[in-house]
């Protein structure tokens, strides 16, 4: 199984030592099968408001995945499909796209691109429960999923 970490997992680790320890423990055993979404990179970079924070995110978060060639980006088809998913949610729930839930735009893109790569997203974000019925084949899990043992 392959994994990607959602933005909220990193934010929790930045803010709380116990969450950081849990993330590091997971990565210690799962780094070879863990990937970074380019969409998550964009969200984390946008949240790094100081030069030092930007450097820390680049060196401590992005570079380990980049060095291993473990960054994936949504395809053109993923952008189109995620747009259709958002339109469906907006119509069902009767909300205005950019004012009601702007983070859902990226969440839909993350869901579709994870599905494209056959990657399970680790997240605490409840929006993925709403999105998963609309993105067939997308899988997500709460932190921290059990790892398969040796065969």
Describe the residue ranges of each PLM region.
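Generic structural signal for small/hydrophobic residues in well-ordered secondary structure
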Residues: 6-7, 44, 82, 114
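Active-site neighborhoods of divalent-metal-dependent phosphate/nucleic-acid chemistry enzymes
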Residues: 70-120
């Amino acid at each position: 199984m392959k994994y990607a970490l959602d933005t909220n997992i990193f934010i929790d680790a930045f803010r709380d030592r116990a969450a950081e320890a849990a993330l590091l423990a997971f990565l210690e055993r799962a780094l070879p099968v863990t990937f970074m979404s380019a969409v998550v990179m964009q969200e984390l970079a946008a949240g790094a408001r100081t030069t030092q924070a930007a450097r820390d995110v680049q060196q401590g978060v992005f570079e380990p995945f980049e060095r291993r060639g473990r960054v994936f980006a949504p395809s053109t088809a993923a952008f189109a499909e995620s747009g259709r998913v958002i339109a469906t949610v907006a119509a069902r729930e009767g909300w205005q796209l950019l004012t009601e839930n702007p983070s859902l735009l990226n969440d839909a893109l993350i869901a579709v691109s994870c599905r494209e790569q056959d990657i399970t997203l680790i997240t605490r974000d409840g929006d993925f429960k709403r999105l998963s019925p609309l993105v067939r084949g997308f899988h997500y899990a709460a932190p921290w999923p059990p790892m398969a043992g040796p065969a």
